[in-house]
Amino acid sequence: MATELPHLIWIDCEMTGLSLEKDVLVEIAVLVTDSELNVIGDGIDLVIKATPEQLAGMNEFVTQMHTASGLITEIPNGITTEEAEDAILAYLQASGTQPGKSPLAGNSVSVDRNFIARDMSRLNEYLHYRTVDVSSIKELARRWYPKIYFAAPAKTGNHRALGDIQDSIEELKYYRSSIFIEAQIQGQNPPAEKVD
């Protein structure tokens, strides 16, 4: 009998930009799903305080994005990065995840992982080294299944971290039902567990 697969830890971050040299995290949201993409609990969405100088360093596009989403007005009342990391780790432990077992999931999540590795080392160590990146599946669908790609659900997250995660989960559910169709293999039982 196959063992139960670890949960997925979905993370989305909003930053002042994409540069690890100068930009900072200003929002992080986390949701946990089981391996069937069912959301476990309510998730957590945290705004992180940035200095006026850090906000002044944002380019026009990022400034407009965070203004339109309403995030810009919440940042001055945000919490510290350390407080955010503590809250996230407590949420993950309460959600039934175990250190080093659950992959990070999201859209273009390598960017988020770089900021997490820089600013939240305990969270980075808590995550499995593997990643489920929905944007990779989207790129493959665009090349190999364009009809499915163009019929994908529209995003509604409005560049807020929790909404973006919810969009990513819905997008992966869509690709799962449209592309990842279960094949029956005659005369073979799947192995109980694969080690790789």
Say what each PLM segment does.
Residues 2-11, 15-104, 153, 196:
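Conserved non-catalytic scaffold segment of RNase H-like nuclease domains
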Residues 20-22, 42, 115, 141, ...:
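Short, function-defining helix-loop hinge/capping sites that tune catalysis or transport
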Residues 24-26, 118-121:
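Short, glycine/charged-enriched secondary-structure capping and boundary segments
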Residues 25, 114, 139-144, 191:
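Catalytic phosphate/metal-binding cores of nucleic-acid and nucleotide-processing enzymes, i.e., regions
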Residues 50-53, 60-63, 134-170:
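Active-site-proximal helix-loop-helix substrate-binding element of RNase H-like nuclease domains
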Residues 74, 87-90, 94, 114, ...:
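Residue-level signal for well-ordered alpha-helical scaffold segments within enzymatic catalytic domains
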Residues 99-109, 114-120, 147-196:
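Acidic, Mg2+-coordinating catalytic module of metal-dependent nucleases/exonucleases
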Residues 120-131:
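A short alpha->loop->secondary-structure connector
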